[in-house]
Curated annotation (Swiss-Prot):
The protein, known as: Regulatory protein RecX
GO CC entries: cytoplasm
GO process terms (BP): regulation of DNA repair
UniProt keywords, alphabetically: Cytoplasm
InterPro entries attached to this UniProt entry: RecX_HTH_1st (IPR053926), RecX_HTH_3rd (IPR053925), Regulatory_RecX (IPR003783), WH-like_DNA-bd_sf (IPR036388)
Keyword presence, Hydrolase: no
Annotated gene: recX
Protein family (similarity comment): Belongs to the RecX family.
Amino acid sequence: MKITKIEKKKRLYLVEIDKKESLYVTEDTIVKYMLTKEMALSKDQLEDIKNFAQFSHGKNLALYFISFKQRTEKEVRDYLFKHEINPHIIPQIIDNLKKDHWIDDYKLLESLAQQNLNSGDKGAYALKQKWLQKGCEKQVIDEVLTQFDFSEVAIKVTSKLLRKYQGKLPTKSLKDKLIQNLINKGFSFQESKNAINQLELEADEENEQALLYKEIEKQYQKFSKKYDGYELKQHLTQSLFRKGYDFDAIASALREYF
């Protein structure tokens, strides 16, 4: 068999074999095999050309994909598969890119962890879950995260949350709200507690009393339609206690209220 036509098509070349079979190859393939019109090819040579063409094209696609931002190994694999690169060739491309340090999950995760430390708001658990979803290996993730202490991030997030909720909730409920928000952002329970303790929250008794009386009014409107007397007081007490108000403060306020 021989090459009967070579024609440039944008980024690739169309190579026609015996005017019957055609394939697209990269410029690197043309150069590597010194392909020319009328060149004779054996079956094995043609197979080698096809494989290298896939490898070269796939690598070019991967480098284009990586040029926008750093990618994980799995993201590059998925991208190549999506662009119909031969699944048997993809591992070769990945190995080549890793050898040349175009793909390095460890360094990528280090960079992302540092970004989170500088300007992010996530704890280690949230980062780990996100990276696992991106296909990074658990061992690599754990090795990276052991290098970082996100306690300062937790304090920064707590300060921001405090500005949002302080003065609107009793101290106990405020602390519970802060802990829940911090846990939702991937910080451990202990990290959350430590961050709150660092800020040394102090109860504003005057404000808490005002909040308590406001809540009593609200709950009274709700329960007085169904209960009265001792039963009404019991339901009010239980409801207010669940909302984080101090039991003695509730009892004192209800004595004044009734």
